[in-house]
Amino acid sequence: MRTALLEVGLEELPASEFHSILRQLEEKSAELLKAYRISSGSVEVFVGSRRFGVILNNLPERQEDFTEEKKGPPLNIAYDENGKPTRALEGFLRNNNASLENVVHREGYVYLSRVVEGKPVEEVLPDLFRDLVLGLNFRKPMRWGSGEHEYVRPVHWIVAMVDGRVLDLEIFGLRSSRISYGKRYHAGSIEIPDPERYYESLKKGFVISSHLERKKFVLEQIDEFEKRSGMKIERDEELIEEIVAITEYPRIVVGQFDRKYLELPEEIIVTAVKHHQRSFIAHKETLTNIFVAFQDGPQPPENVVKGYERVINARLEDARYYFQKDLETSLEKMNEKLKEIVFQEKLGTLYDKVERIKKISQRLCEDLKLPEMFTQKVLEAASICKADIASKVVYEFPELQGVMGRIYALREGINEEIATAIEDHYSEEPQTVIGSILGIADRIDTIVGNFAIGNVPTSSKDPYGLKSKADTIFRIIRKNEWDISLEELLTFASSLVKYHLSEELETFFAGRFYQFLINELGISFDVARAVNHLWKKPLRGILSAEALQEISEKPEFQDLFVGFERVHNITKNHDSTKFDGALFEKEEEKKLMNKFYEVKEKVLKALERLNYREALQYLIELKPYIDEYFDNVFVMVKRDDLRVNRLSFLKNIDELFMMVGDMTYLVKRSQV
């Protein structure tokens, strides 16, 4: 078995492309190996800040053979009346370098059928690797040199080998070789003897090509620091992944900043150090002034540590200045400054948005029938929920939006419940009732406002994150079990921006509700379709979906489905529900009618309590009565009055089933 290597060397990759390249290499390698008929035991993908590529293990000597077929002329044209090949057939064979031995007859035509031997892998791999490299997609590709080529970053070298042999490959005007390059400024060219020794060869040049090994190396150094220092480092997965993406040989740097900055709120310190210097803060019961960073390359000299300390101290000094300045201004005054900050050009300022959030929040409180005293807390929180956007700290550290609002509110002595809601309403899963109300109001205003000015998301573009905001609204409603009319809230919010609730906006929310049910709750496609019309009252749709999903996985679903199906199939083109029980002639009609009235009362009471599981169990009770009815009663009799009366009666049962969900969308399960 053979091993192949492809390495593409480039200028520094943006960290934002790291996971995309990794995923594409994995997917496209598998696709291309299949397309080129090459079986591979395993595919190793690697991505670093200055290189990416693949190692293909356990390759065969050759491609797999395949049977080639080509359609030729019809049989009546290919042969004469004596069964001899005509000129048409002879020309077809000659043009395809084939003989009569390769001819088969099928469906009235001549076909060429011949086994084509696979080529040696070293002949095929150059094309496969070229397709792989050129088949990658990037968010923001760039041109370089004469502008002839476009790629994520300028490409400087290519290594392409099978075993110890260099492949004949040229891309971007560069010919492949066995020469790679180590860490810039620390190592020059590195000769790769063969793919098996690729990783160890690069390590000599301070490059760990495998992203998995780099991550392991980072975590090992953190573990070692903790054992040595007795301190703890929070394993921030996002930061660790970023370090892995931007380094090729991450080495730990331990430094410290001035202890005076520990007087700042912890959130400011962590943000300044993490987001702006990609460093961790060490803990020992409480936050310490020790930080851990990662330098790319060999063991960092002392001046590197000093450099980190100088930059972090400067950032924290700036943060302290901004924080102290902010403390001189109340949230109320910050809120007034929102009049100078545009939310969106056609939707006014952030102050205007806050006013709309207050009105939507009040309407939501009314819908939820919340006490007046609690409603006042909600409105107080709403009035300052965006105030910190005007603060100096948030201007410098936008990721602290909401966090600083809570901190400043507590410093002013504002009720903790209100202060917490300022931060909480930004969360995709708010933990407080006030935060949940503000979270819904804020997101509804943003979605409705954007639709009002024509910023409608598409399947591929959603620059304002409206889909995610809609999903969060459904998530909040489910968590709090709020039986509210989303349609009425949207209509009210629309009136605040002089917009009429459009079919386009309704379609958007219906679509997001469908995706929410499937992606977040694990509801099957047919059940999601069955309840999708209930998006206007999301909690009911969610509870109905969960109940239907649960019963669809049990044997009794058969009784529910068959009972509904027998009734619905015969009444689907009938509209009236007016019937006269006095016209019933058979005992089975009367028994089903009596059972229907009994079940209907139970179902309606269960639905009043939003107990869809119970409602479904009651509906199942109808199944034997429905079966008995259809076994003994002929519905489509010639007498118009009897036929219409029976259809109208059955239509009542059909509509009772439909109260739980549109069961016409349900797919029959295999269980019995």
Swiss-Prot record:
GO cellular component: cytosol
GO BP terms: arginyl-tRNA aminoacylation; glycyl-tRNA aminoacylation
Catalytic reaction annotation: tRNA(Gly) + glycine + ATP = glycyl-tRNA(Gly) + AMP + diphosphate
PROSITE patterns xref list: AA_TRNA_LIGASE_II_GLYAB
InterPro entries for the chain: DALR_anticod-bd, Gly-tRNA-synth_bsu, Gly-tRNA-synth_heterodimer, tRNAsynth_Ia_anticodon-bd
Gene Ontology molecular-function annotations: arginine-tRNA ligase activity; ATP binding; glycine-tRNA ligase activity
Compartments (UniProt record): Cytoplasm
UniProt keyword annotation of Transferase present: no
Enzyme nomenclature, EC number: 6.1.1.14
Subunit-structure text: Tetramer of two alpha and two beta subunits.
Family assignment from sequence similarity: Belongs to the class-II aminoacyl-tRNA synthetase family.
Protein name per UniProt: Glycine--tRNA ligase beta subunit
Annotated organism of origin: Thermotoga sp. (strain RQ2)
Name of the gene: glyS
